[in-house]
């Protein structure tokens, strides 16, 4: 079986706010997601009868509740993406856990249940993250890059010192659903001009489509069973030509035998196939 998980980091305006980009023009870019991009994507997935996973910051849930409710009502998974969209590695242990709890309460308030899955803003966990996920009942994370097509059980308590060999910690029950920047729409598409840097983005969407389809073909040719996770953002991939490319890609992958699942469903399929010893 070759599984595809389409995932969406539903940042709203929180990603810009977390970087101090709070002017009206910056925030309008994020607002496009709940106002325009998300409804388009929900309609697209209804057309193909597939379910996806949306990682949503608490700030987005509290600021755009109707947009988030529409995601839930369409049958998609609502998962955790922090509260302020600040990466855990930038927070103290106390603030990291506080944000984890606060956002999970927002998720329960709107959906009726706590999140099972977590994805770090900016894919930057702290040394404490896995411990907190286990403590608060998460079954999976999707923030690390230790594989491409095979989920694995995350470790904790690694000891990493510059001039010593790595001392790897113990395996935990937390399933890691690996991701990578090459299958994230943001570095390919998003134009970001800051005071001291410029990320051009705005790549040809057809080239991105071909790369992403090729990643699936490689999985199909090299592993008997695997999961490929694509990461998108409603304010990025919800625009004209990009959503057309996404539609074509879904059709191509379906034709090529892809089985589309929510991430929580793929986690359960992995655990059945490879139960922890």
Model-derived segments and spans:
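Active-site beta->alpha N-cap acidic-glycine motif
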Residues: 1-77, 252-254
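Short, well-ordered coil/turn segments that N-cap beta-strands
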Residues: 1-4, 48-52, 74-77, 111-116, ...
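Conserved, mostly hydrophobic/aromatic
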Residues: 9, 45, 78-81, 118, ...
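Acidic-and-aromatic substrate-binding clefts and catalytic sites of carbohydrate-active enzymes
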Residues: 30-35, 53-65, 86-96, 119-128, ...
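Generic structural signal for well-ordered alpha-helices
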Residues: 38-42, 65-69, 97-104, 130, ...
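C-terminal domain-boundary segment and adjacent tail
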Residues: 47-48, 202-277
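Long, hydrophobic, well-ordered secondary-structure blocks that form the structural core
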Residues: 62, 75-134
């Amino acid at each position: 079986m070759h599984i595809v998980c389409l995932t969406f980091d539903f940042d709203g305006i929180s990603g810009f706010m977390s970087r101090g980009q709070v002017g009206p023009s910056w925030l309008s870019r994020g607002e496009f997601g709940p106002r325009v991009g998300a409804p388009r994507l929900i309609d697209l997935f209804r057309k193909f009868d597939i379910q996806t996973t949306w990682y949503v910051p608490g700030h987005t849930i509290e600021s755009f509740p109707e947009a988030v409710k529409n995601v839930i009502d369409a049958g998609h998974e609502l998962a955790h993406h922090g509260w302020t969209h600040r990466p855990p590695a930038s927070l103290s242990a106390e603030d990291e856990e506080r944000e984890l709890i606060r956002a999970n309460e927002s998720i329960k308030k709107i959906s009726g249940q706590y999140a099972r899955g977590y994805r770090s803003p900016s894919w930057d966990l702290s040394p404490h993250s896995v411990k907190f996920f286990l403590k608060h009942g998460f079954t999976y994370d999707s923030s690390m890059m230790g594989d491409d097509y095979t989920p694995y059980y995350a470790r904790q308590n690694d000891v990493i010192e510059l001039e010593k060999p790595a001392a790897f910690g113990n395996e935990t029950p937390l399933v890691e659903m690996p991701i990578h920047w090459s299958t994230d729409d943001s570095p390919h598409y998003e134009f970001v001009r800051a005071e001291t840097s410029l990320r051009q983005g705005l790549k040809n969407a057809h080239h991105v489509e071909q790369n992403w389809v090729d990643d699936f073909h490689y999985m199909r040719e090299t592993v008997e069973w695997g999961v490929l996770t694509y990461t998108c953002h409603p304010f990025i991939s919800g625009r004209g030509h990009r959503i057309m490319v996404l539609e074509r890609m879904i059709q191509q992958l379906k034709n090529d035998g892809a089985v589309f699942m929510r991430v929580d469903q793929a986690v359960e399929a992995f655990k059945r196939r490879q139960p922890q010893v």
